[in-house]
Amino acid sequence: MHFRRTMSRVPTLASLEIRYKKSFGHKFRDFIALCGHYFAPVKKYIFPSFIAVHYFYTISLTLITSILLYPIKNTRYIDTLFLAAGAVTQGGLNTVDINNLSLYQQIVLYIVCCISTPIAVHSCLAFVRLYWFERYFDGIRDSSRRNFKMRRTKTILERELTARTMTKNRTGTQRTSYPRKQAKTDDFQEKLFSGEMVNRDEQDSVHSDQNSHDISRDSSNNNTNHNGSSGSLDDFVKEDETDDNGEYQENNSYSTVGSSSNTVADESLNQKPKPSSLRFDEPHSKQRPARVPSEKFAKRRGSRDISPADMYRSIMMLQGKHEATAEDEGPPLVIGSPADGTRYKSNVNKLKKATGINGNKIKIRDKGNESNTDQNSVSSEANSTASVSDESSLHTNFGNKVPSLRTNTHRSNSGPIAITDNAETDKKHGPSIQFDITKPPRKISKRVSTFDDLNPKSSVLYRKKASKKYLMKHFPKARRIRQQIKRRLSTGSIEKNSSNNVSDRKPITDMDDDDDDDDNDGDNNEEYFADNESGDEDERVQQSEPHSDSELKSHQQQQEKHQLQQNLHRMYKTKSFDDNRSRAVPMERSRTIDMAEAKDLNELARTPDFQKMVYQNWKAHHRKKPNFRKRGWNNKIFEHGPYASDSDRNYPDNSNTGNSILHYAESILHHDGSHKNGSEEASSDSNENIYSTNGGSDHNGLNNYPTYNDDEEGYYGLHFDTDYDLDPRHDLSKGSGKTYLSWQPTIGRNSNFLGLTRAQKDELGGVEYRAIKLLCTILVVYYVGWHIVAFVMLVPWIILKKHYSEVVRDDGVSPTWWGFWTAMSAFNDLGLTLTPNSMMSFNKAVYPLIVMIWFIIIGNTGFPILLRCIIWIMFKISPDLSQMRESLGFLLDHPRRCFTLLFPKAATWWLLLTLAGLNITDWILFIILDFGSTVVKSLSKGYRVLVGLFQSVSTRTAGFSVVDLSQLHPSIQVSYMLMMYVSVLPLAISIRRTNVYEEQSLGLYGDMGGEPEDTDTEDDGNDEDDDEENESHEGQSSQRSSSNNNNNNNRKKKKKKKTENPNEISTKSFIGAHLRKQLSFDLWFLFLGLFIICICEGDKIKDVQEPNFNIFAILFEIVSAYGTVGLSLGYPDTNQSFSRQFTTLSKLVIIAMLIRGKNRGLPYSLDRAIILPSDRLEHIDHLEGMKLKRQARTNTEDPMTEHFKRSFTDVKHRWGALKRKTTHSRNPKRSSTTL
């Protein structure tokens, strides 16, 4: 009741209300949303598209600027309006001298020009789309951050697994020694795992004498070595490595079970075996020099290639380590790893106790239903008085991927491997070995917390096995094996082993109890046995046992009740313990993770603690570790991995974490199915062919790639190491999806994602949102930064150059203000200067001309090129797997989804080549036609070249004049006029042909192929053939020859039309459609304006006294205004543009040309980069996806690149055909001359 009364007081606290105080940004967004709600009808009918909004913005800003300029009243309003329109549109045409304006008016023009440039307008659009993303996608900021961490975690795991695969294959190809001996072993191993009854002595009958001698010598070595340190397993390992000429010195943890166990030789093997004793022949034992006799160990094999001799020898050695102690003292046997640095001797005779089994049995048991390991036994009956007499039970985790060794005396069907010692067999071939192999299931780490968790050096690590049904599918005759297992389980023919010691401690857990529903499916009845040793062992298991069967049952029930669901914040902490805390064996602390509850990699990668652990582990090895030299594949590429030496392992124990993580990650990647379109389709049949046995082509088994079912996969490079010969930032998912998406997208042309689900759209929207957010920052820094750099480069120069300072001062302008204004005018391509004669006064100033050339280019047509270059450089130098790198990668791969002036790689290269070609063409024409003209005769040749370059660059965008254009060659004037018209076309075509909805914007909703044309061609061809057939019946030979020639020609044309690629027709149609649409947009307006001005200025045109007032000068002015360039032929004795001589109506026409030309480079109304996130956008995406699915065409190559590739290929083939034809035509002549 006290607890209930306490709870009743909780609602009193809930009545306290704290009002949320909105931030300024939140209030501003709410205000915009409120305005949008009230102006929704206006937006729908007056501003239906971005182009309409842009027109409104340009006209409104022009009127506002004119209103701001006119109060000074130093000019007429039409001239003020004309000047305002030129500043807003960057047209650069002026009817008044800028230096005659007041400083206030100049500042207004400065600010207005800066906020109305294409870069500023499109950047504002990017900010608007960023705002709309936050409004449309609820919580997109947090969800995008979560998705990024999930993708980063998966990318780390996949990179390490891929690196491991490549390293395994590479390492395996380099170790191919002893191929002849290996072939025999492979044949035996093939028989071993095919389930056949084989005799090991038959396999190696040729070497039986030598092997018998080796066995005897090994037994005598055991007798000698168990009393001294020379008999330790370290000596065996070192001797084995030395004999191999250092081939595996870096793999010292790969010898055998004994090499990883911190034990000494067997006491019980100190007696020489009798001839009638059970023998295991060791194949391919290498001849060693006659020095100190020692135990021989086989080379490191895969977990499926362990020979019975190695297993039996390891068992006997482990058993012989025991010493006589009390029955209730000491811990179980602890098997450490070579990396522990010290070897511990444990008192093993404490484990000796009568188990109720015959004294000549040796039983190996990995107890614990909580870990679901199999329970088997190994027995051998000695035929002499010197048989093994002690009985013990060894508790260790020998691995999980090698078949067990079982007795066949009473239960021949109870284990996968049975050893028989029959009388007949002893007489003929010795003991025979029967193998009945089943695939041991994979185990997943589990952890049990006990009171010993208080001790940081004690731990218990349990393991959980995967489904037996799945694992059995990896072997032939899997159905038969599963049936045998079911029969064994149904008959209960499994020997329950008693143990020596009672586990006095009960596990303490606060986990759920529903963890073992799928564990006790009989899997614990298939005990297996493997040598599980490595310096980077991620699991060290130590278990205790009850005294009797009843205690064993109760202990197992307790363990089953408390199956662990490890909290992820304790993932990387495990401890080991033994039964006697005061005598605890100090073991190296490992960091593992409980992944049993993760159903797939996506679920695991979304766990925050797991993400943090993986990233910290990766960053510790990839960012903090110094890498002063690059290592190749043969130069210790895995310095801290399984192939590392002991000296290289002295760094933080992070590889164990990587081993555990990647072991589970790889199993999930293969086991749970493929990741397609964001969904994981678990398919058991799809994984049947993943597990493949490699025939043992490598002597050491390194080519046998340990798949995800192998517990030892951490030994083959499953660690976090940057020292593989790969680019650490290499995009492993190239061609199979990018790292910024967790699913494999289907992408059409121009970054059109097809067939997305709601979750995928949200994830893609989050990635696009963060990319736009980063892009907005880049745009602001770009725009403001280059403005600062421009005036920083010009202001000091004009101040230091006294001559040019005086020129500026004579025009009534401060040199400092000239530097600021000229820098702005050059970067924004305004074309207006504070000096009346534009840049003619600086035609010999090399420095400002070169600086202005750079800023003219990067401020307009070169902006997309430089922007992509900056993003690419940032991508290269950004931290790997960072959020910035992911966003930059998305911008590089799908630029037109985010920004209108950012193009893909191919389109950017084409734009660069186009701009360079146009500028170089103008430059060459100027040098050819005007290099010796009177207008530049006063300049030296070097200055003439520089003036030509500056004028060719200014002609297309800026409108600066460094020479009198009216004095140039007429052909140069025509070329300049043409360049002013096409100035924006490369940029406009690039914008439109990279549009995500390119086909819809052009009105092309079907295949652009030529099926109707092909049909018509075939019909025409048939008609022609019929006509030719009719003509062939005529009797005249001339008609026959002409008809044959026509037939051949028509057939060639027909074949050419048929073989023409429909995609090529589509490419040509797209490019042609863009050009036709652009011309239809431009030409009628240009000629309409020319017509109106000719009407208004007819009298001046006809006046003979004004020869410079002609139609060409008017057309030049119109094209300059329409191209927003600002070049003008001028009028004699004036500094202003030619437009100053126009009437008011003609000036209004020029203003209309300026506003119209400002919008000619905009994208179509149907463009992904200008449509705000809304239901309309989703509807358009749906229509586009349906159309492309119907067309079954998802070509992502750039159309122009594809077209030119085909054209080049066609030209190449035609050239080759022409050469062959010429060669064939020459050969008959040569043969005839020789005759």
Curated annotation (Swiss-Prot):
It is a multi-pass membrane protein. Residues 219-232, 1036-1049 have a biased composition (Low complexity). GO terms for molecular function: high-affinity potassium ion transmembrane transporter activity; potassium ion transmembrane transporter activity. It is found in: Membrane. It holds the Pfam family TrkH. Glycans are attached at residues 100, 169, 222, 227, 251, 369, 383, 497, 501, 532, 580, 677, 919, 1030, 1135. The modification Phosphoserine is found at residues 15, 414, 534. Residues 161-310, 323-344, 361-441, 488-565, 671-706, 1003-1063 are annotated as: Disordered. Its main location: membrane. Keywords: Glycoprotein, Ion transport, Membrane, Phosphoprotein, Potassium, Potassium transport, Transmembrane, Transmembrane helix, Transport. Residues 164-179, 248-274, 370-415, 490-502, 680-706 have a biased composition (Polar residues). InterPro entries: Cat_transpt, K/Na_transp_Trk1/HKT1, Trk1_fungi, TrkH_K-transport. GO terms for cellular component: cell periphery; membrane raft; plasma membrane. Residues 237-247, 510-539, 1010-1031 have a biased composition (Acidic residues). The chain crosses the membrane at residues 49-70, 78-98, 107-127, 778-800, 813-834, 838-858, 862-882, 898-918, 923-943, 971-991, 1078-1098, 1111-1131. GO terms for biological process: intracellular calcium ion homeostasis; intracellular potassium ion homeostasis; potassium ion import across plasma membrane. This protein is required for high-affinity potassium transport. Belongs to the TrkH potassium transport family. This is High-affinity potassium transport protein. It comes from Saccharomyces cerevisiae (strain ATCC 204508 / S288c).
